């Protein structure tokens, strides 16, 4: 290959190194940790990682010599796998802790676990936990940098980041778009983080769902609230469906899953009320025939669901690389 030959992998790496910046805070616990310029910079960096991840050679040495520890106290496929891939592609030593085979299963508290792990000197800790505030608590007990991978019903900031990346790549922008977030908003940390980040990036957000699955005074989030799909989806550019989180429900929030799909499940008829060219999203895992019809979910002309999975790795690489720049005191 000549010196002037086109080399996409090298170009992606050069772009990444030019765009890496020190993360604005010590930890990434909330979508609210980012202002608009910082969020845009992180999305630009993630874009460069998308280009790299599509090459044969995908690895960098940004985290070489660093240890990334994944602490997933709740089951996860997409998030844990993407953080593991992100860490390895950046050159980190990745350790996955399984709570079922750890001292947590013997009754050890989260604080004691944090103190124990801190003694091992990990540089980065990615934590998912069923309790809201768990990531924040952990961040107060460790010297490493903590990334919140989902804490109870509170937040899931890297999901919001990958969703914003998916939207921006599909439309070329986020600002000025109308995003309808539909379904089980009450139990959704994804919804909370998305509302915050989408507002920061200039989108208009609606929440759509039955009254039983809508947080009290949700309007205080700066959103329009709708209890029927007809008005909620009217003119929306993006329709983001949420999983019905039956495992978090203690009581009869919906009459039945069949009844739920009839009124709130996304099918072609309901989608037709959205704006021409509207895109469909779902954070996964999907309950087909409950939140969304397979005909819609699997249609590449409207669905961004597989794009979201791909963007997850790139977005998390961007977060980890920025935290690494903070560790090194480098970046712009």
From Swiss-Prot:
Q: Which GO terms describe its cellular component?
A: cytosol
Q: So, what pathway does this thing act in?
A: Pyrimidine metabolism; UMP biosynthesis via de novo pathway; (S)-dihydroorotate from bicarbonate: step 2/3
Which residues make up the binding site for carbamoyl phosphate? 78-79, 128, 156, 159, 284-285
- UniProt record, GO biological process: 'de novo' pyrimidine nucleobase biosynthetic process; 'de novo' UMP biosynthetic process; amino acid metabolic process
Which EC number(s) does UniProt give? 2.1.3.2
- GO MF term list: amino acid binding; aspartate carbamoyltransferase activity
Which domain of life does the UniProt lineage start with? Bacteria
Give the PROSITE patterns listed for this entry. Answer: CARBAMOYLTRANSFERASE
One protein family per Pfam? OTCace_N
**Reactions that this protein is recorded to catalyse:** carbamoyl phosphate + L-aspartate = N-carbamoyl-L-aspartate + phosphate + H(+)
Record: residues binding L-aspartate = 106, 189, 243
Could you list this entry's UniProt keywords, alphabetically sorted: Pyrimidine biosynthesis, Transferase
Output the InterPro entries linked to this UniProt entry.
Answer: Asp/Orn_carbamoyltranf_P-bd, Asp/Orn_carbamoylTrfase, Asp/Orn_carbamoylTrfase_sf, Asp_carbamoyltransf, Asp_carbamoyltransf_Asp/Orn-bd
Physiological role? Catalyzes the condensation of carbamoyl phosphate and aspartate to form carbamoyl aspartate and inorganic phosphate, the committed step in the de novo pyrimidine nucleotide biosynthesis pathway.
According to the record's subunit comment, the protein's assembly and interactions are:
Heterododecamer (2C3:3R2) of six catalytic PyrB chains organized as two trimers (C3), and six regulatory PyrI chains organized as three dimers (R2).
Tell me its family: Belongs to the aspartate/ornithine carbamoyltransferase superfamily. ATCase family.
Instruction: Identify this protein by name.
Output: Aspartate carbamoyltransferase catalytic subunit
The species is Caulobacter vibrioides (strain ATCC 19089 / CIP 103742 / CB 15) (Caulobacter crescentus)
